[in-house]
Amino acid sequence: LALTQMGHNDIADSSRPVFDGATGQHEAVAEHGGLSALGKNAVRSINALGGIIDISQLSKAAALQVLALSDAPVIASHSNVWQLSNVSRNLSDEEIDRIGESGGVIHVAPFRGYLFDSSDETLDQAIRAARQVAGITEDFYYPFELYWEIEDEAVQQKFLRTVSDLLGPGSIGDVIDHIDYIVSRIGVDHVGIGTDFNHGSGITGFNDASEALNVTIGLLARGYSAEDIHKIWGGNFLRVFRAVAVSKDKAIKE
């Protein structure tokens, strides 16, 4: 269960504050300072019911509070490494470390919009210019943000093509770089792959599920063993699934 997506809600703060058309700006960076009182109760309730908590897209404060409160391992279903790509929804080293300590799993997302270098000022200005031409706010938390607000379909499609061209194609190597980083910090038992294909990945060689074998080939080339790859392609998630069930049963007995 994810606690938020784009925009804050009554449960938690998001890493992607939503744009408010009425005010002409994004909402405040934080509404609750992480989790609300309702959100903290939600964590306890999800634990008690045997649900898996997904911290992807939570603010850093909210994610760390979930990790401190949860009695069971948690996952990030589709999140990358902030140190390699400083996009607001990607995970800091502190979040990565706490997920490892919880016994959880971080699923790296093969999506170009989460794998680019947002510290590149030239790229940033080019994306802002494209957004201005398309008639949406220049400020953004990820490059394609608010494309759905562009009413003219031709303008919308041109904007999507322009941003895709500016970002350029990502590679399977880019994806595995993030896997490597997580493995180096918390071990191969705590990493997986979480696709986000609803917009296409923008990753050459892994644009949809039919090309998943290319990732396996890339992992082998990086020196990962068959056992490691089994863990990355779902074994780690299944371990968490079982651990959460055990945690629920233990709570019931207590």
Language-model features: where?
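Active-site beta-loop-alpha junctions enriched in small/polar residues
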Residues: 4-8, 51, 56-61, 79-82, ...
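Aromatic-lined glycan-binding groove of carbohydrate-active enzymes
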Residues: 92-157
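Short acidic/histidine-rich active-site segments
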Residues: 108-110, 185-209
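Conserved, mostly hydrophobic/aromatic
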Residues: 53, 78, 106, 196, ...
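Mid-to-C-terminal alpha-helical segments outside catalytic/metal-binding sites
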Residues: 207-254
